[in-house]
């Protein structure tokens, strides 16, 4: 928080929501509800590396949908994937499945039933919303890596240094 402050030095706006204990992503969003407002927002996991063109999501119109997910082909550490994708809609069918890339546009309504301060994951909310046809998605097949472990981060770092 000290390093980035409110983001004004870099031309962005950062608002911090304090968690006394980790609340998972949906719980954290519910905790920050007053900071986020009522408009859809971009959610990006801190432990991914990619060359996805984020500007394509600026002003993304969810319409009546609750989320738009970016999915990727399943990486070796997650071969079963998370969701299906058919006709631009995310689903829960057994196959073919893709992995959530850690990039989404989310309506705050997705977490409307989550109490501020409570621990809650996004995946169950997305599965329920996808079952109602309320989640769209896209498949991204560019450069993407989950760097959520020291080993995966080191492997990517080594690969990026190669000529």
Description of each model-found segment:
Residues 18, 45, 52, 69-71:
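Short loop/edge segments at beta-strand edges and connector loops
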Residues 1-45, 116-117, 162:
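Conserved N-terminal catalytic core of the sugar/cofactor nucleotidyltransferase
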Residues 13-15, 66, 134-136:
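Conserved beta-strand segments of alpha/beta enzyme cores
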Residues 41-42, 49, 53-62, 74-77, ...:
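Catalytic-core segments of class I nucleotidyltransferases/pyrophosphorylases
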Residues 32, 45-47, 84, 107:
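Residue-level signal for inorganic ion chemistry
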Residues 5-6, 80-87:
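Acidic-glycine-rich active-site phosphate/pyrophosphate-binding loop
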Residues 38, 64-65:
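Short, high-confidence coil segments that cap the C-terminus of an alpha-helix
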Residues 68-82:
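Short beta-strand-to-loop element that shapes/binds the nucleotide-sugar donor at the catalytic cleft/hinge
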């Amino acid at each position: 928080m000290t390093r980035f402050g409110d983001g004004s030095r870099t031309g962005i706006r950062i608002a911090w929501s304090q968690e006394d204990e980790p609340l998972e992503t949906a719980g954290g969003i519910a905790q920050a509800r007053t900071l986020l407002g009522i408009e859809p927002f971009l959610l990006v996991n801190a432990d991914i590396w990619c060359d996805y063109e984020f500007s394509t999501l600026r002003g993304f119109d969810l319409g009546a949908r609750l989320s738009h997910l970016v999915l990727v082909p399943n990486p070796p550490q997650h071969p079963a994937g998370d969701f299906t994708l058919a006709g631009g809609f995310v689903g829960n069918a057994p196959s073919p499945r893709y992995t959530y890339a850690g990039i989404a546009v989310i309506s705050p309504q997705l977490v409307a039933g989550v109490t501020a301060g409570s621990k809650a994951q996004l995946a169950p909310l997305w599965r329920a919303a996808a079952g109602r046809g309320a989640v769209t998605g896209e498949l991204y097949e560019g450069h993407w890596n989950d760097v959520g472990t020291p080993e995966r981060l080191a492997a990517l770092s080594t690969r990026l240094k190669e000529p």
